[in-house]
Curated annotation (Swiss-Prot):
UniProt subcellular location: Cytoplasm
Biological role: Required for the first step of histidine biosynthesis. May allow the feedback regulation of ATP phosphoribosyltransferase activity by histidine.
Protein name: ATP phosphoribosyltransferase regulatory subunit
InterPro entries (alphabetical): aa-tRNA-synth_II/BPL/LPL, HisRS-like_core, HisRS/HisZ, HisZ
Upper classification of the organism: Bacteria, Bacillati, Bacillota, Bacilli, Bacillales
Subunit composition and interactions: Heteromultimer composed of HisG and HisZ subunits.
Signal peptide: none
Keywords: Amino-acid biosynthesis, Cytoplasm, Histidine biosynthesis
NCBIfam families, alphabetized: hisZ_biosyn_reg, PRK12292.1-3
UniProt family annotation: Belongs to the class-II aminoacyl-tRNA synthetase family. HisZ subfamily.
Gene that this sequence comes from: hisZ
Amino acid sequence: MNLNKNLPTGTRDKLFREAQAAYKIEQQVNHYFEKRGFKRIETPVIEFEDVFSSEHQADAKLYRFFDEKGRLTVLRPDMTLPIGRVVSTTGVTLPLKLSYSGKIFRANEDFGGEQNEQTQAGIEIIGYPSIKAEIECILSGIGVLNALEIPNFQIELGHAAIYRRVIQLLNLSETAEIDFRQLIQNKSLTGIKRFVANNPSTLDDFILAIPRLFGPATAILSQAKNLTTDKGILTALHEMETIVEAVSYTADISVDLGLVQDFHYYTGIIFRGYADLAADNFLSGGRYDHLLEQFTSSSSPAVGLALNLDSLTTLQNRAGIIKKQTPTTLLIHYDLEALQQAEKFMQETPNSELSFFETASNAISFAKKWHIPEVVHVSSQGIQTIFQREVD
């Protein structure tokens, strides 16, 4: 039988040093969240498609398949909706501070360079309407990046209510809204100028400026307030100012008033994290106060933060932070009747490991191949050095 030895698009293997680094990063992140008082939650990788089929996930690219009963299931494309399902269906008492880590899957287009399988970690703060919840998410994200020694990172703030308010006042069709969203995301000055000419409103000056309204937080927010008198937008700008003042002591904070998240469920402050050594954002999140309504008749205020751990592993590697794995310095060849003694000797000797070869000569050959400087033989007669690499 000829097996297909290629990997599915958007997936990859991790070996040795990279795999160990990814494992340690996930441990560090989870430990950091635990220290901040977050309680861990785990959900299945496989969910029924209904969990992700709402309007909030209209753009999600799902891995779909049928179970043995013919029901449509998917590999989860994010963690937030499954956690919303748990909170809404188990009757847990709010408010909650939850943390998680695990795999997510998104069926991206071929040759786009995106990973279809990602390791994600994050937090969900549910039941807190206060802006302190956003502040906690941002501070937690900054704390993780500092703990991982990520160099030259920057946190960028936006506000989902700004885009929603603009769309509300323009009263666009679904097709026109998609086109407008694309113009905003691409910061197309020419395209937006043409759009405003064809769709005049009281927000013309503000909309025309959106492609330029990004950069240092204080200056951009001050400029934006002079471009509109709309109460909804001004309220959003005030919330952004409050957060900037609260967290700017911890990191470099910028704003982008044209920031539009891929998922439509965000309702308030949104944020992303970037670094000099990364091509894309590796941290994202924001407020979504109506997301849980798809699972229950009532809504709960919520804020979430997600970290792409694969991107953070790559960042650490590029920054030279990932340490080499501790090399084996002693190989222990043993006779079966001396196994107990060999095991005890290994436990007491740092950077040692047992040999699985039947003969001492094979153990020595292995040590030479993998640059292990010393081999000992453990037998009923005791412990004897049988190979020692010459020091140059």
